[in-house]
Amino acid sequence: MSSSNVKKVALAYSGGLDTSVILKWLQETYGCEVVTFTADLGQGEEVEPARAKAQAMGVKEIYIDDLREEFSRDFVFPMFRANAIYEGEYLLGTSIARPLIAKRLIEIANETGADAIAHGATGKGNDQVRFELGAYALRPDIRVIAPWREWELTSRETLLAYAESRGIPIEMKRGKTSPYSMDANLLHISYEGGILEDPWAEPEETMWRWSVSPENAPDRPTYVELTYEHGDIVAIDGERMTAAAVLARLNQLGGANGIGRLDIVENRYVGMKSRGCYETPGGTIMLKAHRAIESITLDREVAHLKDELMPRYASLIYNGYWWSPERRMLQQMIDASQATVNGVVRVKLYKGNVSVVGRKSESNSLFDMNIATFEDDRGAYDQKDAEGFIKLNALRLRIAGRKGASFA
């Protein structure tokens, strides 16, 4: 499909510099009508100004959707049932937001009769892959326009010059841009670029926006009780909440105690290494607490199998395969495992640390104090049974040893 065949484009629009320039560029380059879509994922910024900017550039169809609850309930919570982390550290805050944006963008394209969608992801990053894999899965014949892979605007300064030359309303001025590229939603805020491109450079304390430094966190710990039903947090300190409210509250509690900061170099799907800094206070608490409630409610082999599958599941999300048959299959297995994950976890938040200090389940605990006790178990467990168990498991080792094998 050539540019002349594109009549209407649905644009994922934040109202910032990049997507505002993209909006005008689409109008000029493709001569098409543009529909804008702005998602409120709990990024903490006013999204309504995006409406005024889009209107000022002649956009007739403007969508601004509050997706905070859907994001938390249908994307973040299912991911945390799996205890998903990428490369042992990253809690996938950016990755998990992209499939929802792609889904809603395709829905809007269908509603408005758009024959193409557009996004502001660069040609170097993972987001282009995540947006487009999702879009093609949900509408195989959709045309995707990725301006960063087409135009000759290669820097923030050239974008600002373009905006000025066309009267695009942009708050930031040339030479006064933020040193970091930031992305936020209810799960996290990320920082890239600037001095972070040097993996040896320590970020300034002023970069962090959601959390106090652990050194300056309160000198007294905060205790929190989290109630779980089927693997999801449904109440904090006994107060039942929606998924979005749970995440917002845990972000507050974690941020106030210096929890959730992360500075990593990760392997992007496109092949390069990238350094990023993240604040995920609520998610950090959720991961620790969920593993704790699973520790007393999951069968050993089920728990171990989940741990084996988790890296694969996390990679699927990181690489953009949320809308795939393999992710769906894994999700069904994970969700089935959570039927018994019910109970309460008590955590202590103190100077950047999350410590589990209690866990209980009235209906589904597999922890038997009568068997596990170091005191007199009154015959609940016959220690003599261990001898046969050990000998059976040692049989292959003993046979190999008799045949001359050396394990030292």
UniProtKB/Swiss-Prot annotation:
One of its GO terms (molecular function) is argininosuccinate synthase activity. One of its GO terms (biological process) is L-arginine biosynthetic process. InterPro entries: Arginosuc_syn_C (IPR048268), Arginosuc_syn_N (IPR048267), Arginosuc_synth (IPR001518), Arginosuc_synth_CS (IPR018223), Arginosuc_synth_type_1_subfam (IPR023434), AS_cat/multimer_dom_body (IPR024074), Rossmann-like_a/b/a_fold (IPR014729). ATP binds at residues 12-20, 39, 120. Its EC number is 6.3.4.5. The keyword Nucleotide-binding applies. It catalyses: L-citrulline + L-aspartate + ATP = 2-(N(omega)-L-arginino)succinate + AMP + diphosphate + H(+). L-aspartate binds at residues 122, 126-127. It is found in: Cytoplasm. Pfam families: Arginosuc_syn_C (PF20979), Arginosuc_synth (PF00764). L-citrulline binds at residues 90, 95, 126, 130, 181, 190, 266, 278. Keywords: Amino-acid biosynthesis, Arginine biosynthesis, ATP-binding, Cytoplasm, Ligase, Nucleotide-binding. GO terms for cellular component: cytoplasm. Pathway: Amino-acid biosynthesis; L-arginine biosynthesis; L-arginine from L-ornithine and carbamoyl phosphate: step 2/3. Belongs to the argininosuccinate synthase family. Type 1 subfamily. Homotetramer. HAMAP family: Arg_succ_synth_type1. This is Argininosuccinate synthase. The gene is argG.
